[in-house]
């Protein structure tokens, strides 16, 4: 039956005799078989017996079977048909419930699967599935590792903003380094398309009274502020309906601040939040309440009540001024941290505050800040406030005030004062940004700050690598909306949680992964054919006690279909914060291993059963059909 179907599908293509590589590739596409061009070329060459660059129908059949009829899939299929040839509906139901742990499977669902994936018409009409249909089903999105339920907005979006992790970028306008790299609108467009919800805009005075965006005091190129926000307006809600926060680094004169305010209002119109919501005058609203809204994050002078009372009045020429303790220049950050070590000897925050004022240690410098009223009044729920101490915040910080903390200081606080840090992030939105010495736009590991509930962990989206893999993997959850509801123990004021200590009343999971095989993995960059010495590393990222990794053996000279059949077990204490990362490498003897591909996702967003792990490049691009084939099981 399958032979008859195959010949009916390809016979016409061989009427003129043999076919070349290009036609063979098109014929594989016609048969719904995804192929990596390099692998197809090598397999074609190996099966072209006369080495003329053209193959017969029998040679093509061999190529098709090599690519489409994988041994590990044949073994699974053969365990279920009563005659080892055809799956009846009841056989498919057994497979889906026993192996794939699919809930609520019935004949109607099975019928839909057969209709979708079975290519042989007479088998389809009989409500049955051949191996051809089974292998297409196993290679489909239905069998991906990522749970489709996590791929939609499934979380409660009515909590206050502070209850969510918010996808955030740093120096969004840059697409390279921070010294000479170009500023580009693509930085904003790309971040928004990826679901980023907090964008950074460095604003400086430009010529002809037009503010510009660039990395100040460097050779990076400049963009007009108005052009930037026009691009943001166009792409803000393509991927997600939930609010976008514009984090302004404002270095503009008063006159150009007014231009910024005018631009924001004219470009965004009603989408720009310029007053408190009626039901949230004294508390943070929810992402749901702020759908399709743009929020401005900047310094603000005066109260929300005063802002409300000025609404509708012309504010041009009006200036607000205050004296505030401003953070020292970025290059002084390390000195500040060393000075703060003296204060860590004291246990009481109030004593530290008094010491700062009474002892000659200069932590902050006083500065008069002037802000155009027109711009200040556009800041509603995301006012920037200098972080002084947890004690100060508990006493004086207002619900609409947010903090920015550099990675060095934040890391120190997260290690020494984790419980207090969590208490802080339960109430106040906290943004963590890379230290100034990262001139190459490198990133820190964001996991340590998610562990303590920091909402806006800002990364350089333009820089690929492990941190961005974790970022992209984490925000796959909840429909790539850019907002993920924090676990209850990071929201609940009564919960006692410290990521650096053994969790109390945790609900750990035991995760078992059988890494079966690789499918058309990217060949080594150094290979002249389609070969690689492949290995897979499985890593867990989460609280410190959950950080672990395990590795397969190396399969020599096989990137097309390596078989490992190795089983790994992980006990994860805090799965709510855990990410799992699969990394495929080519073993290197001298210069270290070569990265071939990776995939990262939240542990609790994994499907059980036989699953396909899609692989992505270092730049985050899909490497389809390259993937891993695994079996997943976990219990709590």
UniProtKB/Swiss-Prot annotation:
The keyword Hydrolase applies. It is an enzyme of class 3 (hydrolase). Its main location: nucleus. Interacts via its C2 domain with PtdIns(3)P and, to a lesser extent, PtdIns(5)P in vitro. It comes from Sus scrofa (Pig). GO terms for molecular function: phosphatidylinositol-4,5-bisphosphate phospholipase C activity. Gene3D superfamilies: C2 domain, EF-hand, Phosphatidylinositol (PI) phosphodiesterase. This is 1-phosphatidylinositol 4,5-bisphosphate phosphodiesterase zeta-1. It catalyses: a 1,2-diacyl-sn-glycero-3-phospho-(1D-myo-inositol-4,5-bisphosphate) + H2O = 1D-myo-inositol 1,4,5-trisphosphate + a 1,2-diacyl-sn-glycerol + H(+). The production of the second messenger molecules diacylglycerol (DAG) and inositol 1,4,5-trisphosphate (IP3) is mediated by activated phosphatidylinositol-specific phospholipase C enzymes. In vitro, hydrolyzes PtdIns(4,5)P2 in a Ca(2+)-dependent manner. Triggers intracellular Ca(2+) oscillations in oocytes solely during M phase and is involved in inducing oocyte activation and initiating embryonic development up to the blastocyst stage. Residues 375-491 form the PI-PLC Y-box domain. Residues 311-338 are annotated as: Disordered. Residues 35-70 form the EF-hand domain. InterPro entries: C2_dom, C2_domain_sf, EF-hand-dom_pair, PI-PLC_fam, PLC-like_Pdiesterase_TIM-brl, PLC_EF-hand-like, PLipase_C_PInositol-sp_X_dom, PLipase_C_Pinositol-sp_Y. Residues 321-336 have a biased composition (Acidic residues). The active site is at residues 170, 215. Residues 491-617 form the C2 domain.
């Amino acid at each position: 039956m399958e032979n008859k179907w195959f010949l009916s599908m390809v016979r016409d293509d061989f009427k003129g005799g043999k076919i070349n590589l290009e036609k063979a590739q098109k014929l594989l596409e016609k048969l719904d078989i995804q192929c990596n061009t390099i692998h197809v070329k090598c397999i074609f060459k190996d099966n072209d017996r006369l080495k003329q660059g053209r193959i017969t129908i029998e040679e093509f059949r061999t190529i098709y079977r090599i690519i489409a009829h994988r041994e590990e899939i044949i073994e699974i299929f053969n365990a279920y048909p009563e005659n080892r040839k055809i799956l009846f509906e009841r056989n498919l139901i057994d497979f889906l419930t026993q192996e794939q742990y699919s809930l609520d499977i019935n004949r109607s669902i099975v019928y839909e699967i057969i209709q979708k994936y079975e290519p042989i018409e007479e088998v389809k009409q009989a409500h049955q599935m051949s191996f051809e249909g089974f292998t297409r089903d196993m290679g489909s999105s239905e069998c991906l590792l990522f749970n489709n339920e996590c791929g939609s907005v499934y979380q409660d979006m009515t909590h206050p903003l502070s209850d969510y992790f918010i996808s955030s970028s740093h120096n969004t306008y840059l697409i390279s380094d921070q010294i000479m790299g170009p500023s580009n609108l693509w930085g904003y467009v790309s971040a928004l398309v990826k679901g980023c919800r907090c964008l950074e805009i460095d604003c400086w005075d430009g010529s002809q009274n037009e503010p510009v965006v660039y990395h100040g005091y460097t050779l990076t190129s400049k963009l007009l502020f108005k052009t930037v926000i026009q691009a943001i307006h166009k792409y803000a809600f393509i991927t997600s309906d939930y609010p976008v926060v514009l984090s302004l680094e404002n270095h503009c004169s008063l006159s150009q601040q007014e231009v910024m305010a005018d631009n924001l209002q004219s470009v965004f119109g009603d989408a720009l939040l310029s007053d408190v919501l009626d039901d949230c005058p004294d508390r943070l609203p929810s992402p749901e309440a702020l759908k399709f809204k743009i929020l401005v994050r900047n310094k603000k002078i005066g109260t929300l009540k005063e802002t409300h009372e000025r609404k509708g009045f012309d504010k041009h020429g009006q200036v607000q001024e205050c004296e505030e303790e401003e953070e020292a220049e970025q290059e002084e950050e390390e000195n500040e941290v060393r000075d703060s070590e003296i204060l860590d000897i004291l246990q009481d925050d109030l004593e530290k505050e008094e010491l700062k004022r009474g002892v000659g240690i200069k932590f902050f410098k006083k500065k008069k800040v002037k802000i155009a009223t027109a711009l200040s009044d556009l800041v509603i729920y995301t006012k920037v406030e200098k972080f002084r101490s947890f004690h100060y915040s508990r006493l004086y910080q207002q619900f609409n005030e947010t903090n920015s903390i550099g990675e060095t200081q934040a890391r120190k606080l997260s290690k020494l004062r984790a419980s207090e840090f969590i208490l802080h992030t339960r109430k106040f939105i906290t943004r963590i940004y890379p230290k100034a010495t990262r001139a190459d736009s490198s990133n820190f590991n964001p996991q340590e700050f998610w562990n303590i509930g920091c909402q806006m962990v800002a990364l350089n989206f333009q820089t690929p690598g492990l941190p961005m893999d974790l970022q992209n993997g984490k925000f796959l959850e909840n429909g790539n909306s850019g907002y993920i509801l924090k676990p209850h123990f990071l929201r609940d004021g009564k919960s006692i949680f410290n990521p650096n200590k053994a969790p109390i009343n945790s609900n750990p999971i035991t995760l078992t992964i059988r890494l079966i095989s690789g499918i058309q993995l990217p060949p080594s960059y150094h290979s002249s054919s389609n070969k690689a010495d492949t290995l897979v590393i499985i890593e867990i990222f989460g609280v410190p006690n959950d950080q672990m990794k395990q590795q397969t053996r190396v399969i020599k000279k096989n990137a097309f279909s390596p078989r490992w059949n190795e089983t790994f077990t992980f006990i994860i204490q805090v799965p709510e914060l855990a990410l799992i990362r699969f990394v495929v490498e080519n073993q290197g003897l001298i210069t270290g291993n070569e990265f071939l591909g990776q995939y990262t996702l939240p542990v609790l967003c994994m499907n059980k059963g036989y699953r396909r792990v899609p692989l992505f490049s270092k730049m985050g691009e899909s490497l389809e059909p390259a993937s891993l084939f695994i079996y997943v099981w976990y219990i709590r």
